């Protein structure tokens, strides 16, 4: 008897609550003040105050939409997302899908307002009998509000409040739901709901869910497919068919039964739908997320790093990353799949994943700085023979390795400094096999520097050489003397203007006596882009990987884009191009790397003790730098004993080891491109504009020095005596020779006779 009385009292209380909620809904819809004081038993005073303080409209967070990164030709590179979602308008969602979700979640959706009074009464009676909230009874609009509040939550406390099983939360949702119903039509609300909902297994929104589970668009969903998806929304994890196929089928069949009960489908349609398989596991499509799943992971990560530096995407790196993964951005990059494939084919031909040495190549377009390709021999990943290091970029970028000493490729900047100062390509310096530079002062930007014990040697040609001859042979003693003549500050300034700096520290390259021999750490990206400046006749363009960004509505997002400036005069660059072209002529260190009818220029680079070898070269169309190196920190292992292409490296050189990588990549990359030519240097660059050197043969050293000094030249006395018909101790000849036209300020070396003809 008492039990029956309790049941009657419970049902009575539920009825009172129902009436209260109905009054509440009406009052909210009318915008009236709520007399909460008389509503005890249904909600606490705290809930009442909360309701009174809520804003009129729900501020929803922008819908998280996945972003895509594309190559220059529009092909896919990567998808970036926090939630895998592609929103679609309601007319691109099949009618059967719309009916299925309404049937199972809110069958009277188009008949009631923000509150479904019948559903709420049913839930309240259940909850009162259980003593806690057990059944939702929420309308689709209320569910949309709840999902929006969860989506908007930034903190754990906000997420907890958005999912709390309390009447206070229900009242909050109801207040917002009333505002939503005033602001949007039923179809608009349903569209928002279906695009926001979580459909399990990482699929957000009905379009992504349809593609994920069935490989079709939301517009093509069939009855059994729609029923399965509609059943997921209540519990995306519990009813996920990839986790529990039986539960997913039971839930799908329940949706089908409900649709039949509401006469939305026929009995035959229901029976046929129940017979259909829930999913075909072979058709499930996982959308790869992030750069790790990209075809070009290293390039992708570098592009993302550049995007995270862009303030147009947010005030902080964290905000930018969030926008990058939720903003539905279309990111177009400079990567050219054809050129990337050419560089990758070269790596495959000349290196193996299992090699103990590493190989890397970057290809850049002169005149734009567009990074067209970036490859390396070690694939992306963990474990044996894999790496997360990007061997082509600076250490300041996530995963950046930080470069390698670049050896004689640095001589190109010394050449540029010499030409800029008026030294012609015919400028001669006596360049012995070994030279003693101990204690010699070299001018720097802050004063001078010297090495107390420095006696460098040549590994190739020595003698009285012109700039072109010395470049062809990569004669160390020539370029060390040339760098003393130009001063290290000039070389450092030109290198910095061409984008060169220490890739380990981001500091300027050290101005040391051996600077021209390439002792600073640089990257293939840095070096290829610097050489591209020569190809572009002195126009430097910062390396660019992201060419444009559009938001989800197609509006452009500001990006740095291409940025170029003239850092060398075209005449100086033309001179550098002529000198480095000679390197690739017969007899030059790069002569074996010549191909086709292209105008080619380049420079070898071999690090002392063979820690790394380089070849950097270019045409007017493309510039590339290839490196082969030991990649074991802290860069102390020699190349000897390492393997490349499965073979032991016995004689590592820039031309013989790194050169073939460069040659194959460039030859393939240039296929189909227009043939362009370097501009020949003018006569002033080639031969100088100075007066003929006055004859001083037969003069005493003092007399010759006075004569040449008055003519504007710097005079150096060689310590070597040479065979000559001139009297012993007098001048036998000079370097440059009598009749040459070195520019004013040039160094002239006096060679004295030993008196032996």
Annotate each predicted stretch with a short phrase.
Residues 1-68:
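N-terminal type II signal-anchor transmembrane helix
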Residues 56-66, 135-143, 148-173, 217, ...:
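Extracytoplasmic/periplasmic proteins that interact with beta-lactams or build/remodel peptidoglycan
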Residues 77-86, 208, 212, 237-241, ...:
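Short pre-catalytic segments that frame enzyme active sites
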Residues 129-154, 286-292, 423-491, 540, ...:
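Conserved catalytic neighborhood of penicillin-recognizing serine enzymes
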């Amino acid at each position: 008897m008492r039990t029956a009385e309790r049941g009657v009292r419970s049902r009575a209380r539920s009825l009172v609550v129902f009436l209260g909620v109905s009054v509440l809904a009406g009052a909210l819809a009318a915008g009236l003040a709520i007399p909460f004081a008389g509503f005890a038993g249904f909600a606490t005073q705290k809930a009442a105050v909360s309701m009174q303080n809520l804003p009129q409209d729900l501020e929803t967070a922008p819908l998280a939409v996945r972003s895509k990164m594309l190559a220059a030709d529009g092909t896919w590179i990567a998808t970036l997302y926090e939630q895998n979602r592609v929103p679609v308008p309601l007319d691109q969602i099949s009618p059967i899908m719309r009916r299925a979700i309404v049937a199972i979640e809110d069958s009277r959706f188009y008949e009631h307002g923000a509150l479904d009074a019948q559903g709420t009464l049913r839930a309240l009676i259940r909850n009162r009998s259980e003593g806690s909230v057990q059944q939702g009874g929420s309308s689709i609009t209320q569910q949309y509000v709840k999902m929006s509040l969860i989506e908007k939550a930034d903190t754990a406390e906000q997420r907890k409040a958005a999912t709390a099983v309390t009447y206070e939360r229900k009242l909050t949702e109801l207040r917002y739901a009333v505002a939503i119903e005033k602001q949007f039509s039923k179809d608009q609300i349903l569209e928002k709901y279906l695009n926001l909902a979580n459909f399990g297994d990482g699929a957000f929104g009905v379009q992504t869910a349809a593609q994920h589970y069935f490989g079709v668009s939301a517009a093509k969903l069939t009855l059994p497919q729609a029923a399965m998806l509609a059943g997921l929304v209540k519990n995306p994890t519990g009813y996920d068919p990839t986790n529990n196929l039986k539960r997913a089928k039971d839930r799908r069949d329940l949706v089908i039964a409900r649709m039949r009960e509401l006469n939305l489908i026929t009995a035959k349609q229901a029976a046929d739908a129940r017979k259909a398989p829930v999913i075909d596991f072979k058709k499930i499509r996982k959308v790869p997320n992030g750069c790790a799943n990209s075809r070009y992971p290293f390039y992708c990560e570098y592009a993302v790093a550049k995007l995270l530096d862009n303030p147009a995407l947010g005030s902080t790196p964290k905000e930018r990353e969030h926008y990058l993964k939720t903003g539905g951005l279309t990111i177009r990059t400079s990567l050219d799949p054809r050129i990337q494939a050419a560089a990758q084919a070269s790596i495959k031909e000349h290196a193996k994943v299992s090699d103990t040495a590493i190989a890397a190549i970057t290809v850049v377009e002169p005149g734009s700085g567009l990074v067209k390709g970036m490859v390396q021999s070690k694939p992306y990943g963990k474990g044996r023979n894999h790496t997360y290091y990007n061997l082509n970029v600076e250490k300041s970028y996530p995963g950046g390795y930080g470069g390698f000493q670049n050896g004689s490729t640095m001589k190109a900047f010394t050449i540029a400094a010499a030409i800029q100062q008026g030294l012609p390509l015919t400028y001669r310096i006596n360049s012995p096999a070994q030279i003693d530079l101990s204690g010699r002062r070299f001018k720097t930007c802050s004063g001078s520097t010297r090495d107390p014990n420095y006696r460098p040697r040549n590994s190739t040609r020595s003698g009285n050489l012109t700039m072109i001859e010395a470049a062809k042979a990569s004669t160390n003693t020539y370029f060390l003397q040339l760098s003393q003549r130009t001063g290290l500050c000039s070389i450092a300034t030109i290198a910095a203007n061409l984008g060169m700096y220490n890739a380990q520290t981001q500091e300027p390259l050290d101005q040391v006596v051996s600077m021209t021999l390439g002792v600073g750490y640089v990257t293939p990206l840095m070096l290829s882009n610097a050489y591209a400046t020569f190809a572009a006749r002195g126009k430097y363009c910062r390396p660019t990987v992201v060419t444009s960004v559009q938001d989800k509505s197609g509006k452009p997002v500001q990006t740095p884009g291409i940025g170029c400036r003239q850092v060398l005069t075209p005449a100086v660059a033309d001179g550098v191009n002529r000198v480095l072209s000679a390197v690739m002529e017969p007899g030059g260190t790069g002569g074996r790397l010549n191909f086709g009818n292209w105008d080619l220029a380049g420079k070898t680079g071999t690090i002392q003790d063979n820690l790394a070898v380089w070849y950097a070269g270019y045409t007017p169309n493309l510039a590339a730098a290839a490196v082969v190196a030991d990649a074991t920190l802290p860069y102390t292992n020699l190349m000897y004993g390492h393997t490349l292409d499965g073979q032991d490296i016995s004689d590592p050189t820039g031309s013989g080891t790194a050169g073939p990588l460069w040659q194959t990549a460039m030859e393939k990359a240039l296929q189909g491109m227009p043939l362009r030519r370097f501009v020949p240097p003018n006569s002033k660059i080639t031969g100088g504009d100075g007066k003929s050197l006055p004859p001083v043969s037969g003069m005493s050293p003092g007399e010759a020095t006075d004569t040449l000094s008055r003519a504007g030249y710097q005079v150096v006395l060689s310590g070597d005596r040479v065979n000559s018909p001139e009297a012993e101790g007098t001048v036998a000849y000079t370097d440059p020779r009598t009749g040459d036209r070195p520019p004013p300020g040039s160094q002239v070396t006096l060679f004295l006779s030993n008196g032996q003809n």
